[in-house]
C-alpha cells in the first residue's frame, strides 16, 4: 500500500510508515505520476483535491491535515467512493495565539488597553470559541456572530454582523469559506461593511482570504480612512495584492495556524482517521512526538498586567517575525509558498513553563493556556 503525503506535514513519514509505503511530495502541485499507483493521499490546504486531480486514479482515501476543507471537493469524493477526513480544530490554538500576538503588538504601539476595547468575533467555532474564552479571561468584552449556530439554537448571545460593525472596536474573522448558500461567507466583509467600520477600528482576517473583499479593503486604506489591518490570508493566494500588503499593519503568509503543535495535531488526526478506515485503529499521544521547548522555565514576580503578558506572548511568538519576511519577497514568484515550506519552528504558549509568586497571575496564565504554576519565590 502506497501513501502520498505532503512534504510539509511534520511526522507524516514517521506515522504513516506504520500503515504502508510512504512517499513525500510537493503539495502545490501534486505530481500526477506519483498518484498513479497510490492508495491514499494526505494533503494540506495548498492542494486542490477534485475530479481533475483524482479521476482515473486508485486513491481510496484522502486526508487533509487542516481544519478547513474548502480546497477539497467532498461531493466528488463521496461520488467516487473515496474515504475522507479532515482535522477540525487542529490549529485553533495556534490561530488564537497569532491573534493575541498581533493585538498586543498593536496595543503597545497605539497605547491602548485590550480591556478598553470590544472585540467582535465572526465565526464561533473551534477558533472563535477559544478566542472568546481567552479574551474574556482577561476581562475583554466580546460580541459573537455565528448565523449557523444562532439558527440551530445553540447556546450563546449571538448578534448580527451589523451589530458587531456598529459596536466592535476590533473585528476578527474565523469562518469557513462558503462561496454560496444561506451562510455564504465569500466577501462577507464587502465594500459596504468595510466602509461602515469605525474610524480607528482593527480588522483581522486569519481564516480564508476571500472572506474579506481585498479590493474594497485596499480602496478604504488608499482613501486614508483610519483603519488598522492584520491579514494572514489573501485574495488570491499565493499571488497576493502587493499594494494591499504595503498598507496593512501586519501581513503574513497564511501561517497563523503553523505551530509545531498545530501541525502535529493535524497529522495525527488524519493518521488516526486513516488507520480507522483501514480497520486497524491506532492512537498517538502528541507529547511523544514533540521536542523539548526552547525555554525551560520563566519566573514571574508580581501580578500579570498587559505589558507583562505581551512580553510572555512575544517570548513564545512575536508576529512581527513573520511580517518582515513576506514584505521582503512580496511579488516574487514562488516566494509565498517558500515562506510556508521553510517556516521557522514555532511553539504554543503551553510550551512555556511560568513559575509565579502571585497566585492570581498563575491562575490567569493557566486560563490563557500557559503552563503556569503558583510557587512563592523566596
Curated annotation (Swiss-Prot):
Pathway given in the UniProt record: Cofactor biosynthesis; pyridoxine 5'-phosphate biosynthesis; pyridoxine 5'-phosphate from D-erythrose 4-phosphate: step 2/5
Localization (cell): Cytoplasm
Keyword tRNA processing carried by entry: no
Residues that coordinate or bind NAD(+): 146, 175, 232, 257
Subunit record text: Homodimer.
Protein name stated in the entry: Erythronate-4-phosphate dehydrogenase
Enzyme Commission number, as recorded: 1.1.1.290
Enzyme class: oxidoreductase
NCBIfam families in alphabetical order: PRK00257.1, PRK15438.1
Gene that encodes the chain: pdxB
Annotated function: Catalyzes the oxidation of erythronate-4-phosphate to 3-hydroxy-2-oxo-4-phosphonooxybutanoate.
A biological process term (GO) from this entry: pyridoxine biosynthetic process
Organism (species): Cronobacter sakazakii (strain ATCC BAA-894)
Major place of residence: cytoplasm
Gene Ontology MF term list: 4-phosphoerythronate dehydrogenase activity; NAD binding; protein dimerization activity
Amino acid at each position: 500500500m502506497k501513501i502520498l503525503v505532503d512534504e510539509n506535514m511534520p511526522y507524516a513519514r514517521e506515522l504513516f510508515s506504520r500503515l504502508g509505503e510512504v512517499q513525500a511530495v510537493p503539495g502545490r502541485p501534486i505530481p500526477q505520476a506519483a498518484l498513479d499507483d497510490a492508495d491514499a493521499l494526505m494533503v494540506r490546504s495548498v492542494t486542490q483535491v477534485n475530479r481533475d486531480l483524482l479521476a482515473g486514479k486508485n486513491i481510496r482515501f484522502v486526508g487533509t491535515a487542516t481544519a478547513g476543507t474548502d480546497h477539497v471537493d467532498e461531493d466528488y469524493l463521496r461520488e467516487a467512493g473515496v474515504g475522507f477526513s479532515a482535522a477540525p480544530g487542529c490549529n485553533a490554538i495556534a490561530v488564537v495565539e497569532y491573534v493575541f500576538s498581533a493585538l498586543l503588538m498593536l496595543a503597545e504601539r497605539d497605547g491602548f488597553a485590550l480591556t478598553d476595547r470590544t472585540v467582535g468575533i465572526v465565526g464561533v467555532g473551534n477558533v472563535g470559541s477559544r478566542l472568546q474564552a481567552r479574551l474574556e479571561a482577561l476581562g475583554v468584552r466580546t460580541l459573537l456572530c455565528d448565523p449557523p449556530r444562532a439558527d440551530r439554537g445553540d447556546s450563546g448571545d449571538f448578534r448580527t454582523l451589523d451589530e458587531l460593525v456598529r459596536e466592535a472596536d476590533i473585528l476578527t474573522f474565523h469562518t469557513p469559506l462558503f462561496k454560496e448558500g444561506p451562510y455564504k461567507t465569500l466577501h462577507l466583509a464587502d465594500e459596504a461593511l468595510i466602509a461602515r467600520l469605525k474610524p480607528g477600528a482593527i480588522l483581522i482576517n486569519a481564516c480564508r482570504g476571500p472572506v474579506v473583499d481585498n479590493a474594497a479593503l485596499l480602496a478604504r486604506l488608499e482613501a486614508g480612512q483610519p483603519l488598522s489591518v492584520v491579514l494572514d490570508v489573501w485574495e488570491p493566494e499565493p499571488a497576493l495584492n502587493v499594494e494591499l500588503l504595503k498598507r496593512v499593519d501586519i501581513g503574513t503568509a497564511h501561517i497563523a495556524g503553523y505551530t509545531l503543535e498545530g501541525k502535529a495535531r493535524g497529522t495525527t488526526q488524519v493518521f488516526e482517521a486513516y488507520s480507522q478506515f483501514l480497520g486497524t485503529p491506532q492512537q498517538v499521544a502528541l507529547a511523544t512526538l514533540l521536542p523539548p521547548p526552547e525555554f525551560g522555565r520563566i519566573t514571574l514576580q508580581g501580578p500579570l498586567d498587559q505589558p507583562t503578558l505581551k512580553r510572555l506572548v512575544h517570548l513564545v511568538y512575536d508576529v512581527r517575525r513573520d511580517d518582515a519576511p513576506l514584505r521582503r519577497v512580496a511579488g516574487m514568484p514562488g516566494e509565498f509558498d517558500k515562506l510556508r515550506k521553510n517556516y521557522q519552528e514555532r511553539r504554543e504558549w503551553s510550551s512555556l513553563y511560568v513559575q509565579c509568586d502571585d497566585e492570581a497571575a498563575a491562575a490567569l496564565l493557566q486560563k490563557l493556556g500557559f503552563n503556569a504554576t503558583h510557587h512563592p519565590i523566596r
